[in-house]
Amino acid sequence: MSLDHATVRRIAKLARIRLDEEEVPRLAGELNAILGYVEQLAEVDVEGVAPLSGGAQMALRMREDEVTDGRYPDRVLANAPERIGDFFAVPKVVE
């Protein structure tokens, strides 16, 4: 599979990533390299290999749920480019 420049622009638009026109060929090359690697992985014979669901096979401790304010909401919200009250303001992405 190979992505053309129009497809790269469409992916960027859907991901809400602003691309300059000179970035499109470089990004197309990088994405095509990634897709090529994924195609190689699809060709690997995994007959008889048990599926892996996680890296470490250990039991995790459960903890009680508790409602908190995050301990430092003002510091967290200080990173927001825009906020409405105590919430991050984000652009609408679903039409």
Curated annotation (Swiss-Prot):
Recorded GO MF terms: asparaginyl-tRNA synthase (glutamine-hydrolyzing) activity; ATP binding; glutaminyl-tRNA synthase (glutamine-hydrolyzing) activity
Q: Where are the transmembrane segments?
A: none
Arranged from A to Z, the UniProt key words for this protein are:
ATP-binding, Ligase, Nucleotide-binding, Protein biosynthesis
E.C. numbers = 6.3.5.-
Q: Which Pfam families match?
A: GatC (PF02686)
Q: What class of enzyme is it?
A: ligase
Give the GO terms filed under biological process for this record. glutaminyl-tRNAGln biosynthesis via transamidation; regulation of translational fidelity; translation
Q: Is Hydrolase tagged as a keyword?
A: no
User: What start-end ranges are recorded for coiled-coil regions in this protein?
Assistant: none
Catalysed conversion reaction = L-glutamyl-tRNA(Gln) + L-glutamine + ATP + H2O = L-glutaminyl-tRNA(Gln) + L-glutamate + ADP + phosphate + H(+); L-aspartyl-tRNA(Asn) + L-glutamine + ATP + H2O = L-asparaginyl-tRNA(Asn) + L-glutamate + ADP + phosphate + 2 H(+)
- State the superkingdom: Bacteria
Q: Does the keyword Cell cycle apply?
A: no
Entries under InterPro entries matching the protein: Asp/Glu-ADT_sf_sub_c, GatC
NCBIfam families associated with the record: gatC
Q: How is the subunit organization of this protein annotated in UniProt?
A: Heterotrimer of A, B and C subunits.
Q: What does this protein do?
A: Allows the formation of correctly charged Asn-tRNA(Asn) or Gln-tRNA(Gln) through the transamidation of misacylated Asp-tRNA(Asn) or Glu-tRNA(Gln) in organisms which lack either or both of asparaginyl-tRNA or glutaminyl-tRNA synthetases. The reaction takes place in the presence of glutamine and ATP through an activated phospho-Asp-tRNA(Asn) or phospho-Glu-tRNA(Gln).
**Family matches, as HAMAP family:** GatC
Family assignment from sequence similarity:
Belongs to the GatC family.
Give the protein name, as stated in the record: Aspartyl/glutamyl-tRNA(Asn/Gln) amidotransferase subunit C
Q: What is the lineage of its organism?
A: Bacteria, Pseudomonadati, Pseudomonadota, Alphaproteobacteria, Acetobacterales
